């Protein structure tokens, strides 16, 4: 009996330690995330991936009338269709780099279509981040804010920030049917996907990068 009474405090002591440890973790983790941008970026990427996994994708590339589009826009749509069918790995568009590749996909398509972007930091055609991508289009007078009344055309690059559908993302406009956008994007659930925004969920849509038409 004495032995059982002596053991009771140890049990409660262990339980108390576990509770205190859990509380400490709950307090420490948010501080680490806030003070360590790289960790925050990785967590944001994981959250965005979950959002994308839940988004429906189309199994076929849509029919698009390109007759009245500029040659550059026609090339953009043609290249996007080819890559959608090929479903290549993201490293094809990122020059071999293992990284989030939605902006790399847009950069590669524009480069191959004869309307290359120019990274303000490296001078190269590839812009791997959506923030820099937007800055590039703005600096060159090619950015159309979402609230400007501009109606996007096939071949425009849509750019998002904290979108409930895409997170921080960019993809290419394929169609605009009375406000229902059909887009094709890289790194959507780690693949190239066609998405029809039937619910018109455009919260977080910053605007559009307009390609230089040759």
Predicted regions and their residues:
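Cysteine-nucleophile amide-bond enzymes
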Residues: 1-73, 210-214
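Aromatic- and glycine-rich peptidoglycan recognition patches
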Residues: 2, 14-16, 25-41, 147, ...
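General helical structural elements
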Residues: 18-20, 77, 85, 195-197
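N-terminal capping segments
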Residues: 36-119
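Alpha-helix initiation/capping motif
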Residues: 102, 129, 198-199
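...with weaker cross-activation on analogous glycine-rich loops/strands in unrelated enzymes
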Residues: 116-190
